[in-house]
Amino acid sequence: MLLSTPEQIETYSSSGLWGEDRLDLVFARHAEQRPDDLALIDDQGLHSVSGRRPQCLSFIRTWRRVVALCEFLAGIGMKADTVVAMLVPPSADAAVLTLVASRMGIILAPIPLTSGEADLREKLEQVGAKAIVCCSHYEDEAVAERVRNVAAEMFSIRFVFCIGENAPEGLIDLGDILDGEDNVDEDGLFDHGGQANSNSVLAIHWSSAGSEQARPIGRSHNQLLAIGRYIHEQTDLSAEHCSFVNHHMSGLIGFAVGVVAALDVGARIQFHNFRTLGRYVDALAEFGGQHVVLPGGLWQEAHGLLPMHVREQLISIILVWNREHAEQTVFGENETAARLIDLTNFKDLALFSQIRRHPSEVGSIPLGSINSLRDPSLVWMETFLYGMEESRAQKDSSIVGGELCLKGAMLPHCAFPLAGAVEGKALSATEDGFIHTEIGCHLVTEEHGDQRALFRPLGDLGDVLAFGGFTERGEDLDALYRACIMVSDAAAFVVPSGENSPGHLMAALVVDDKENAREEFFAYLRDKRISSMKWPRDIIFVEAIPRQTNGKVMRESLIEASQVADVA
């Protein structure tokens, strides 16, 4: 499936940012040239996490598994452009499935492992998925059971595959197929079909622009490779290195920056299922991790735990920040051999990264072209502040800024077509093709001589709640909580936690029967089978939901009310 316009393909292909290779073709060359080098290593605790025995695969064993699974899927009738939902933790299996999708022209749709049945069904229906691959469980989350329940209600789902022990009945065990690489015929092992080209969609991730509901965004091989190459030209990731991947496949950081980029350069991938920083550091020491990605807020604690030999082996440390830097405290020290790279995630629509020069610059982004370090004539991305000139013209304005708009080699121009549609809905854009993000920004420095103009994101312009690395539209959560029969009105809000720690999701309820409302409300949420991420940590009872004259919830007042009630 092609979503890129002919103009985009011509522009980025002629510049050299896009090429003709699919991801599987790139990896196959590594497998031919370095067959016995290690490619994929699972977390040694994977079995307790997902029920799957940890794998340790060379390049040739990985490729043989890819070919074996392709032959199996083709044999049961799987065709190009089939959307396959994937609920699998960071693991060798996730990498193999990605290469299989690339080789067959299948479109992967990684979905969060914590998705409730209602959220899962909504995503499957949006993209018209015909098959699902899942793990048997993830920690305490009954992933396979939820998948089976949803698939049983959807006639459009043809296949449900499971990887791992103790899978519920009715699911096809994919583990034996994945482990059956010895059955592959050596003749034709490196024959490559023409199922898809490099501009075909490889994967779907969900992204939202402020007040808009999250929409599926399909990206081609070229767009995903561009993300990985843009980030890692700053890390110097190479085939001799070990890349630690602990972010999940449902986000661009885990999928594109982690898996796709390492498969592209032929680096060894050490997968890790993050539980504690101490365990993470121990794994770094044991497996020799050289390139790591961590939330920016964890850097100070992680820095203090790193033993000397780990500090010396590290080459790059990517610190991930959300799109709002205004209240972040940045730990400035780095007593390691690694370069620090600060990465700003714009709602999984786009990523921006830069090598750290000074902690005060974290979050400051150049206005205009984001050029390649290796070839300044190449432009990975362009930034534009919509409404900045109007803001500058206001004499009484203390802040000059506007809405962040983006375009570039890693950005699509439309959403993935909803089930039954032929074309995807165009993303909101300016006349010059810059995609609106609904992220408010302010200008930090004006352009002066060689000094680039810099701006800093302030946060969402829409009513969006951020907590624990997740974001949800406030009005969606309000409607969910308000639909409980015991509740006459409701609103969600987030109570800040400690410094640099994620906030806690809370709910304010207006009820008549406070004595029974709590039990009834949580029973209602259980019956709705929603994601655990949408469950409030606690609730408060209020006489009325504070609103502005336009009906918008005054969530700051609810935070104050929770502090008075000593609930937060």
Please state what every model-predicted region is.
Residues 1-57, 61-74, 167, 189-196, ...:
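N-lobe entry segment of adenylate-forming
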Residues 15-19, 39-91, 95-99, 119-121, ...:
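Conserved AMP-binding/adenylate-forming core of the ANL superfamily
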Residues 35-38, 162, 167-168, 179-227, ...:
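Conserved pre-ATP/AMP-binding loop-to-beta segment of ANL
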Residues 106-176, 284-289, 293-313:
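Structural core segment of the AMP-binding/adenylate-forming
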Residues 121-125, 132-134, 408, 425-534, ...:
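AMP-binding/adenylate-forming catalytic core of the ANL superfamily
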Residues 162-163, 530-553:
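AMP-binding/adenylate-forming catalytic domain of the ANL superfamily
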Residues 175-180, 291-293, 303-395:
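Gly/Ser/Thr-rich phosphate-binding loop
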Residues 226-242, 250-291:
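Conserved AMP-binding/adenylation subdomain of ANL enzymes
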